[in-house]
Structure formats: structure tokens, C-alpha cells
Swiss-Prot record:
This is Putative transmembrane protein ORF28. The chain crosses the membrane at residues 32-52, 59-79. Coiled coil: none annotated. GO terms for cellular component: host cell membrane; membrane. Keywords: Host membrane, Membrane, Transmembrane, Transmembrane helix. It comes from His1 virus (isolate Australia/Victoria). It is found in: Host membrane. Its main location: host cell.
Length: 85
């Protein structure tokens, strides 16, 4: 019975109004999205390098990927600390 009530609540929830009340930048801060894209591009470059081996491109893509991941992790930790204050 309780499960049916929960399902009913979920069905009645107005997602459009909730999304409009939250701005997209609050859900996905632009800096973090940019860093995720850096990481994703680094991964794609790394995959291309495995197909077309070239030491210069490999070094660039691996460093891009590592920097992107490091920055993402750093920002995530920073946000967690900000919330905890």
C-alpha cells in the first residue's frame, strides 16, 4: 500500500516546474562541465592515439586527460567542502 502511494507521488510530481525553478547552471556549474569536456576529449584523443601511434599526440592526450580528471576531482572536493561549511 505504501509503495502505491509513493508511485502516485512520483507520477504527480511536476518535473517541468522543478527544472524551471532550478537554473541549469545550479545543477551543472559551467566550470565543472568544461573540465568534464576536457577529460572526455583527453580520453577520445587517447583512444585515437592507440589507433594511430604518434608519440607527440600521445603525450598531449594523456596529459590533457590527467589534467582534466585532476581538475574535476579538485572541483568536486572543493564543492563538498563548501557544502560542509
Amino acid at each position: 500500500m505504501k509503495a502505491k502511494q509513493e508511485i502516485k507521488k512520483i507520477k504527480e510530481f511536476d518535473y517541468d516546474a522543478w527544472i524551471e525553478s532550478k537554473e541549469l547552471k545550479d545543477i551543472f556549474p559551467p566550470r565543472i562541465m568544461l573540465l568534464w569536456w576536457i577529460g572526455i576529449l583527453g580520453m577520445l584523443n587517447y583512444n585515437l592515439v592507440q589507433i594511430v601511434p604518434n608519440s607527440g599526440v600521445a603525450l598531449l592526450s594523456v596529459s590533457t586527460f590527467i589534467v582534466g580528471c585532476g581538475l574535476c576531482i579538485g572541483f568536486m572536493l572543493g564543492i563538498e567542502q563548501k557544502k560542509n561549511r
